[in-house]
Amino acid sequence: MFESVVQLLEEHEELQQQLGDPELHADASRSRKVNRRYAELSRIVAAHAEWTQLGDDLAAARELAEEDPAFVDEIPGLEEQLDQAQEKLRRLLIPRDPDDARDVIMEIKMGEGGAESALFAADLLRMYLHYAESRRWKTEVLSQTQSDLGGYKDVQVAIKGTSDDPALGVWAHLKYEGGVHRVQRVPATESQGRIHTSAAGVLVIPEVEEVEEVPLDPNDLKIDVYRSSGPGGQSVNTTDSAVRITHLPTGIVVAMQNEKSQLQNREAGMRVLRARVLAKQQEEIDAEASAVRRSQIRTMDRSERIRTYNFPENRIADHRTGYKAYNLDAVMDGALDPVVESCIQADEEARLDALGTDA
């Protein structure tokens, strides 16, 4: 794996020269790609420099120890540091998910459990908004359908990052959140104090950055307009401002009613539609790839029950990684990093295993 480092170091130097070219910054799309790749390679360059320096230090300590026994005590510590640096570099050389630097569109939907599920969907939204705030990401609610008790039947939010580094990207962290989230607690509507189990679904898809990336033929779109409605189905607008867009080739349907303007709802709908079409295209690519390649690209299953939130025990458990902690109150306030990190580490391990199998 380390044989490729020399080529990456050369690529990093070439990108550094490109970043100094004023013409690059005139092309926003190309500039963004170069900056992201440069940020990604900068981590590898720094890790390689650390690994090389520690190797030199260890070699020097061994040589000096032959003449002066005082240097013998330094060798075990340097060996341990070198092993850690090598493992760090090894992980950085794992091929990244090409979408890691992208922003995302997240959809949270109530599932089994009725009103309690809708309230849990609202709790999940609050958790993700607080998590985004802690990472200084920007959020925008695109569409929402509230339930009678103040929860959400469905809510869509766009989450935008602030870094070109793929390792800090929104998709790199939130792609593991897609799936069924189960909650165990006493519902607000429960008079007997019994614990109920309900669930909400989360869908996370990378956002399209350029319109040209996912071209949509107007002839492939069926657009309906209607009056927006609130909880219970009552109309909240006197004009046909809500928009429903159907992509005929794929059957994907997007409905938007959050804005008072039909034009704004249409623009938001097209934004979500492009992301969903892109996600479908990626699914088809993954399906055609070999089993090993699929595991390298997307190793975490996001289609099944992924996590349980047990409020009476203040416990959160991720069923994919085995992560468990008794700080659910903090997690629901946005302290999601340890949970996400467990997913990232499990993903890296799976990718390393896949590379070993492929070799």
UniProtKB/Swiss-Prot annotation:
GO terms for cellular component: cytoplasm. SUPFAM superfamilies: Release factor. It comes from Clavibacter sepedonicus (Clavibacter michiganensis subsp. sepedonicus). The modification N5-methylglutamine is found at residue 234. Methylated by PrmC. Methylation increases the termination efficiency of RF1. GO terms for molecular function: translation release factor activity, codon specific. Belongs to the prokaryotic/mitochondrial release factor family. Peptide chain release factor 1 directs the termination of translation in response to the peptide chain termination codons UAG and UAA. It holds the Pfam family RF-1. This is Peptide chain release factor 1. The keyword Protein biosynthesis applies. It comes from the Bacteria. Keywords: Cytoplasm, Methylation, Protein biosynthesis. It is found in: Cytoplasm.
